[in-house]
Amino acid sequence: MLTSKEKSDTKRLPMMPIRDVVIFPYMMTPFVVGRESSVRALEEAMAGDKKIFLATQHDASIDEPKPNEIYSVGTIVNIVQSLKLPDGNIKVLVEGVERAKVVSVADDEGFFRATVRTSGFKVETGPQLDALISRVTTLFEQYVKLSQNLNYETMVAAIRVDEPGKLADTVGANLQLTIEEKQELLEIFDPIDRLTRVAEMLDIEIEKLNVDRTIQGRVKRQMEKAQKEYYLNEKIKAIQKELGRGEKSEIDELKRRIEEAGMTADAQEKAMAELKRLENMPPMSAESTVSRNYLDWLLAVPWKKKSKEIRDLKFAEGVLEADHYGLEKIKERILEFLAVRRLVKNPKGSILCFVGPPGVGKTSLGMSIAKATGRKFVRMSLGGVRDEAEVRGHRRTYIGALPGQIIQMMKKAGTRNPVFMLDEVDKMSMDFRGDPSAALLEVLDPEQNFMFVDHYLDVEYDLSQVFFVATANVMHTIPAALQDRMEVIRLSGYTELEKMEIAKRFLVKKQIEATGLDSKQIDFQDDGINSLIQYYTREAGVRNLEREIGNVCRKVARQVVNAESGKDKKAPAKAVINGDKVPELLGPWKFRDLVVEKKNEIGAATGLAWTEVGGQLLTVECTLMEGKGKLTITGKLGEVMQESAQAAMSYIRSRAMSLGIPRDFYRNLDLHIHIPEGAIPKDGPSAGITLATTICSALTKIPVRGDLAMTGEITLRGKVLPIGGLKEKLMAAHRHGILEAIMPKENEKDLPDIPDAIKKTMKLHFVESMDEVLKIALEREIVALPIPGAELPVEAGKPAEETVAH
């Protein structure tokens, strides 16, 4: 263990505060004295034994520090030399003698006089001390070699010192430390502790210098590389100049391409101006890269190239029939468009919007249109887009700016007249960066899109030859102004017969090929496909049907592989997929026919609803409890549906006696109406007659027919108003096995849109009033109650207009 013994002494000396420097013992330091108090202290020392106590002040900005603003530990120094300067200041050279700690300070005729205590330590030598001295010496050698601020003589002088205290002070004085770190070292009186601390500081400083040297080396290499590249580029330019080629030829090539691009006059003028700027720029500058990118984009966009259109209606009809089954209205509209193109020389592009549930073929229709017309096809997905710059691009002032997706897709198409699909146009949103749907207003307006301006290109670009096709699941999320610019064509879901044909013509072949099978290994029969449609999928489109066909094919593929490897010797040579085989492969049915076990029930009726995924059945339940006429409505219903329930309740109360219900029934009863699947939001007025029928059934105790569905809005006077989505609703009823439906009389005009398969198999009742609804929907006829005081009895089936006043 390293040890040292202390002996102390007290002295009284003139004191001088110093700034931005810490004086160590054995250290020769010159500095200038200018403060009046410091000059007096210096003169006092010079008049005596030339010894003065120097201590660093805490804050160098203070001109006349107080004793408590000066560090308490400083150094007693000898004044070696003193020289008075012409400006009145004194330049002195001092040598540190020993460190001392202030005991007390007195103000003595304009300067400080301090009583200080010195501490002398006697160090016991030994191998541990020798090892510490050797370590510090070695570290200091490394430090001097790494540092550019110390010379070799300093290192030699330090190495020759064998006294630990003197070595610590010599090394500490030469380290690049802060004032605080040097003061900390000065305040350590024990030489062994001080030397140990110096060793720690040397380790840290060497690490810093190593990191600094690594960084400097990396920077130097990069600079050398940049200088080398610059030199080589200049040399290449000189060689090319000598050969008569080079940058000039590149500028000439760009100029030729601009002239041949077929740009508008405005765009060509802007391109030429940018080319002139590029010519005057240094080739290695960042701005030249920006200009070059801009010119590349201007030249990449198709200005005059057009696809040669196919205007043969028979060919187009054949393509559409081959790719899609059904969808007659859409096919007619596309063929009408082609007929117009054939008759008119320069017609404007069309803007169609396909609206329908998922999986009915909206996106694939766009590809078929491109194929039928001989045009290129590009697709831009708008789902989740909420930045206007996605459509119009960023201005060139931004770093990394690019054109918007419209221009990027036109570049991808390579022609002025592609079929441009704007997919999921109903799923755009907006935020602080703008509204992309507002940017689309210009794109989809035939009166404006011939001069569409992208923020990046900043020139007018003609989109009038583009055939725009938008797709959406619902219309209500699309802004009205955008709806107004598009011709909306609605795609309903497919009937079971249509799904059967689609599966046989397209899906089965596609999945057999995708799984590596062939017609010799698997055979889908009609009852097998029908089983998949009825019991494993329940959708408006055919996506899930294709998925289930794929599941069957994969399971058969596994059986084929096992049979070939000898693992499954019982596997048949050809898998026949029929109604019995499907459950073996896919497990139990996922969906059951809801009507098979459904009986007529009191207070429960089946309604029809329309959602963005197609038509759906809606069960409405009503129950009675003792109470005071409170109406509770549950099932996550929207405001419109809740108001429909209130209207239905008011109608029942106003017609209570004629419906066989006591007039004051509500005084003693509470009604609770519930629509199951409470987690799913429901809204709309079309459940009005279903709600009224359910309430009437619960109050009269007459069951509602279970094999019947209904839809229609109700008024307070009992009239039945028309609804929307009739085709989808009837298809949902047909899909669930319900073959009888009640609907408003005014919806009879929609019958031509209903598939023939549904009209032939379903019995449709068109009604005008609730009385007609109740006659059809309830199991038996209502018997009216006699009205007290009335001359004539009220008959059941009384017209809805004659309401009872309360």
Swiss-Prot record:
The active site is at S686, K729. CDD domains: RecA-like_Lon. SMART domains: AAA, LON. GO terms for biological process: cellular response to heat; protein quality control for misfolded or incompletely synthesized proteins. The keyword Cytoplasm applies. Keywords: ATP-binding, Cytoplasm, Hydrolase, Nucleotide-binding, Protease, Serine protease, Stress response. HAMAP family: lon_bact (MF_01973). ATP-dependent serine protease that mediates the selective degradation of mutant and abnormal proteins as well as certain short-lived regulatory proteins. Required for cellular homeostasis and for survival from DNA damage and developmental changes induced by stress. Degrades polypeptides processively to yield small peptide fragments that are 5 to 10 amino acids long. Binds to DNA in a double-stranded, site-specific manner. This is Lon protease. The gene is lon.
